[in-house]
A protein has these predicted regions:
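Hydrophobic transmembrane signal anchors and adjacent membrane-proximal interface regions, especially
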Residues: 5, 18-20, 98
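Glycine-rich beta-strand-centered segment in the early N-terminal region that forms part
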Residues: 29-42, 55-105, 110
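Cytochrome P450 core scaffold surrounding the K-helix E-X-X-R motif
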Residues: 46-52
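Short, well-ordered strand-loop elements centered on a beta-strand within folded domains, enriched
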Residues: 16-20, 88-93, 112-117, 121
Length: 169
């Protein structure tokens, strides 16, 4: 199985391409690893900001890409299609930060009934909000059209709290 990824040149966002990356078999996922199938995501001007500040704010480190290229991060939904974590079954639906790709491997850490954190080493050093995934299976606030609105607006809601905290300092 492969993941199709949309990547951009980090120094010229107008240069893009699609690449296919081989995915490991379930048995070869990291311990507590999840293979997520990206279902849908929002793409807004906010995502262009992530790309423009990718080096300074470490956004490019979230989703590794070939040298000189990057995966623009997006907010959206993914479904667990393979799991090596005992408390995260296949079929679980998650909301969080994804690459513009068909799949993502997450190393589940700090798992709770509400969500988890991606504990992959390459994701260290970024704001915790970008490593958090919310469990949304069965939550009507994330179903159908409501989910589309969540993908568009929830990141702005979270940003408002981060800006408030920053200004308070």
């Amino acid at each position: 199985m492969t993941s199709r990824q949309f990547i951009v040149a980090r120094d010229d966002l107008q240069q893009s391409r699609l690449i296919d990356v081989a995915l490991p078999a379930t048995d070869n996922l990291p311990v507590d690893g999840l293979l997520l199938k990206v279902d849908r995501f929002a793409f807004t001007a906010n995502n262009i900001t992530y790309a423009m500040l990718g080096d300074q704010l470490k956004y490019w480190s979230l989703f590794p890409a070939p040298n000189g290229y990057g995966n623009i991060p997006v907010w959206g939904f993914g479904d667990v299609i393979a799991s090596r974590h005992p408390n995260l079954p296949e079929g679980e639906r998650l909301f969080g930060y994804f690459p513009m790709a068909t799949h993502l491997i997450v190393e589940a850490a700090d798992v709770s009934k509400r969500g988890l954190r991606d504990g992959a080493a390459h994701r260290e050093g970024v704001a915790p909000v970008y490593n958090a995934y919310t469990r949304v299976s069965g939550d009507p606030a994330f179903a159908g059209r409501a989910g589309d609105y969540q993908a568009l607006l929830r990141p702005l809601f979270m940003l408002s709290f981060l800006v408030d905290d920053f200004l308070a300092e």
